[in-house]
Design a protein with these regions (language model features):
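Bacterial N-terminal signal peptides
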Residues: 8-18
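Bacterial N-terminal signal peptides that target proteins for export
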Residues: 1-9
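Catalytic cores of secreted/periplasmic lytic hydrolases that degrade extracellular macromolecules
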Residues: 3, 19-113
């Protein structure tokens, strides 16, 4: 019985350590994203009066801290779809439906505007 309890406690400790390491990695990715794009968000806040914190939070969520396929390959940090009047570059990506049309930007700055 003592050995079983010992193994259970060791297993729980290992799981907790793994969870902590993953959370630290995620926090570091979030901090890097915020540091990298905060100036863009502040510029847009001045233009449109949307708080930079809200813009950054949405960008973090939609782009997976800049790690999503859309963010990496098309600089689309907000999951913005093409829409009927979009005439710029596009990329196809599976989202709510297969092969949906998303806007592709030359620079992340364009996604923030």
């Amino acid at each position: 019985m003592k050995h079983t309890l010992k193994f259970i406690l060791i297993g729980l400790f290992c799981c907790l350590c793994n969870f902590t390491v993953q959370a630290q990695t995620r926090n570091r990715q979030y901090e890097e994203y915020i540091h990298k794009y905060k100036d863009l968000a502040i510029d847009e806040m001045k233009r449109y009066r949307i708080p930079a914190s809200i813009t950054l939070a949405q960008g973090l969520l939609e782009s997976g801290a800049g790690k999503s396929t859309l963010a990496r390959k098309s600089n689309n940090h907000f999951g913005i779809k093409c829409g009927g009047d979009w005439t710029g570059r596009t990329v196809r990506h599976d989202d709510d439906a297969r092969n949906e049309c998303f806007r592709a930007y030359k620079h992340p700055r364009d996604s923030y505007e």
